[in-house]
Amino acid sequence: AAAVLLLAMISTAVYLYWKQSPSVSIPMVWQTEPLPGSARAFLVFASGETVNLEDERNFSPQQDSDVRLDNKDNTLTIKSGQPASVATEEYQTLVVPRGGEYKLVLEDGSRVYLNSNTKLHFPLVFAGEKRVVHLEGEAYFEVAFDSLKPFIVMTGGMEVQVLGTKFNIKAYTDDQAIFTTLVSGSVQIKERESAHTALLRPDEQCIYTTHDGRMRIHTVDPQVS
């Protein structure tokens, strides 16, 4: 019965493809919040310094005293007093272990909800012409709008580019596919090797299979839980 319900939610073409590829499962949970877990995370600075966010409240990285990090209510917020034009774009890593979850507010105001067993590589300040982060695992993004500086999520063999929107990406390294689900706005997905692109609209999900680099788009129901 569960299989019938799942297949009814996707198009005939996608159904036929996945019927021939049963090793890849299609997640039907519309996830706009992290899965239940405990608020556990570690922050690894570019310098190699590691901070357990369960223990620390407010602090500054050793390599940049102009940046302030506020850590409260299971949320790490980055505040920079340094203009982006003079900042250096060194990448830090927020690590959420298995069974944990955490929220990150980036320097531009964008919010990222990290799920269990997830890593996000990000700069303290977006100094270049693009806002680029790297994701391993699953996260829900609420991207602050900036028409002059697109926001790009690099994951696996693909990249997702937006100006301001809400979307979820599931890209665990052990999975055979990357799932990008759009809640609002629009996103452009690009397969890096072939440069093939696809445009997502609200209530659509892109399934990118890592073994062949193919992208398929189908409609999803945002009320499914």
Predicted segments with their positions:
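A residue-level detector for the "anchor" residue at the start of short, highly conserved motifs
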Residues: A1, I10-S225
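Conserved beta/loop motifs at nucleotide-recognition and modification sites
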Residues: L6
